[in-house]
């Protein structure tokens, strides 16, 4: 199987989703600005998203897919369906209970998440109401993640990658046409999240039916596969919780800063998640099932080659990407967000965060890939320990960095600790002789750096030619922005070609 083909497919779907996500954020910034209302929505929306990341997305798939691959290799359809039915029954019961409890304790959760919202009280009341509306999203999106994991195991990668598009379409549609029907109008965003999550789930069901894996839940929780997954999920949840606890504490810090800080961080976070999602998430998704399959079959050499291929692809894209984001931070934010109530000051504050986030872009992507390498071996404790250590380091650094850099200090702290996480994981893989920095790898890295340095020179020339970004129509600004990125990208590819790095050589065929 040619892994570059599904990678391109998943990346393309993710790109479409992220572009729609930017359209969504542009509309939110234009209609609602960076205010008490957007702070309330972003905080409320982060809570079900946080729980999703702890209990479903990464954590669940890391434990679930290797076990499912074992069932699949036995080629006993009845056993596979019984296993999936038990998983579905357990998840439905647990998530429904979590949704009910979350709705009941919404105000307390908001106060824990953002104690700065206690004053003014209107901010707390609004956040609580928004959270109660959106809490069922955790149920919908977690079941959608289960469907995605099953489809990925059958090599249906592009279908799950396409599903997040429906959430963005829902938010865009209801924001534009129905915001005037709600008071305050920000409530429309909460309902659009629920509708989008429901469509995400329903969209994948016909494809499960196509592969004959659409099952009904049962409540026989003594299934061996289910018990294995629950046993593995303990360390996985602890590791995922460490990352999310870090985000919670970061939000607590930001809620105590100037009004708008949460929104500035959110918009910068959305921009850095664009390349992380397109490359990091897409690549780790495609790699994970193949890594797990090769490890289960004892093909260690193929496993190592596959991981090396993923890391090289990541470096080729992420190094120039981080440079472009750093130097084009302000123009990108002006072009995408400076409309309506989004001011020059908002642009400046958001750009500061984005520049510091871009310093950690390479490590954000590398950590996802290296974590997948451990999860494919069913070795969950090492990423967990690394996450716990970086959580502690992150929070030790936060007060110091926030004192000097205000809200941007949170981004700098995350970038530094992400690099530490990468070094810890790579050291463990090096000790196991899975990764190594041999002469060929060292030369490859040097060549990528040289190509990037030449690109930086050309990028400075382009920026000098187009020094004013806040005038002109949206189309005019978009064309100028893409021209700068296009010229930089062509320069980078040209230099890689001169240095002997051919992209066609990265068509990897997995055995």
Swiss-Prot record:
Involved in peptidoglycan biosynthesis. Transports lipid-linked peptidoglycan precursors from the inner to the outer leaflet of the cytoplasmic membrane. One of its GO terms (biological process) is cell wall organization. This is Probable lipid II flippase MurJ. It comes from Buchnera aphidicola subsp. Acyrthosiphon pisum (strain APS) (Acyrthosiphon pisum symbiotic bacterium). It holds the Pfam family MurJ. CDD domains: MATE_MurJ_like. The chain crosses the membrane at residues 25-45, 85-105, 133-153, 156-178, 245-265, 271-291, 315-335, 356-376, 400-420, 442-462, 481-501. It is found in: Cell inner membrane. InterPro entries: Lipid_II_flippase_MurJ/MviN, MurJ. Its main location: membrane.
């Amino acid at each position: 199987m040619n892994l570059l083909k599904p990678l391109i497919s998943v990346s393309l779907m993710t790109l479409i989703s992220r572009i729609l996500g930017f359209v969504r954020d542009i509309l939110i910034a234009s209609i609602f600005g960076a205010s008490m209302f957007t702070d309330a929505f972003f905080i409320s929306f982060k809570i079900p998203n946080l729980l999703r990341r702890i209990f479903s997305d990464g954590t669940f798939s890391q434990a679930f897919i290797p076990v499912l691959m074992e069932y699949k290799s036995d080629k006993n359809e009845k056993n596979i369906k019984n296993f999936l039915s038990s998983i579905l029954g357990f998840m439905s019961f647990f998530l429904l209970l979590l949704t009910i409890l979350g709705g009941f304790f919404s105000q307390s959760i908001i106060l824990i998440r953002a104690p700065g919202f206690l004053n003014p009280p209107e901010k707390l009341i609004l956040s609580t109401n928004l959270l109660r509306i959106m809490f069922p999203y955790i149920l919908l999106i977690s079941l959608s993640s289960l469907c995605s994991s099953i489809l990925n195991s059958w090599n249906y990668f592009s279908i799950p990658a396409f599903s997040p598009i429906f959430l963005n379409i829902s938010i865009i549609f209801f924001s534009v046409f129905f915001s005037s029907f709600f008071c305050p109008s920000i409530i429309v965003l909460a309902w659009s999240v629920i509708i989008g999550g429901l469509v995400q789930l329903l969209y994948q069901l016909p494809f499960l039916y196509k592969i004959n894996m659409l099952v009904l839940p049962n409540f026989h929780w003594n299934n061996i596969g289910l018990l294995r997954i629950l046993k593995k999920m303990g360390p996985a949840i602890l590791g995922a919780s460490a990352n999310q606890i870090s985000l919670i504490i970061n939000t607590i810090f930001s809620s105590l800063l100037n009004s708008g800080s949460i929104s500035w961080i959110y918009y910068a976070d959305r921009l850095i998640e664009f390349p992380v999602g397109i490359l990091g998430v897409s690549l780790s998704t495609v790699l994970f099932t193949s890594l797990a399959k090769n490890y289960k079959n004892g093909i260690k050499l193929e496993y190592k080659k596959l991981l090396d291929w993923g890391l090289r692809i990541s470096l080729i894209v992420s190094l120039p990407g981080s440079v472009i984001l750093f130097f084009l931070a302000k123009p990108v934010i002006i072009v995408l967000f400076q409309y309506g109530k989004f001011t020059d000051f908002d642009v400046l504050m958001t750009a500061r965060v984005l520049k510091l986030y871009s310093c950690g872009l390479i490590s954000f992507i590398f950590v996802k890939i290296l974590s997948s390498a451990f999860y494919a071996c069913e070795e969950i404790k090492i990423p967990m320990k690394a996450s716990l250590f970086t959580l502690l380091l992150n929070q030790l650094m936060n007060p110091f960095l926030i004192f000097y850099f205000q809200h941007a200090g949170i981004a700098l702290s995350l970038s530094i600790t992400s690099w530490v996480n990468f070094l810890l994981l790579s050291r463990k893989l090096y000790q196991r002789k899975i990764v190594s920095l041999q002469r060929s790898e060292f030369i490859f890295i040097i060549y990528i750096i040289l190509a990037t340095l030449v690109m930086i020179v050309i990028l400075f020339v382009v920026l000098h030619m187009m020094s004013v970004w806040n005038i002109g129509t949206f189309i005019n600004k978009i064309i100028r922005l893409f021209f700068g990125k296009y010229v930089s990208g062509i320069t980078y590819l040209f230099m890689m070609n001169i240095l002997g790095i051919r992209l066609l050589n990265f068509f990897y065929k997995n055995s």
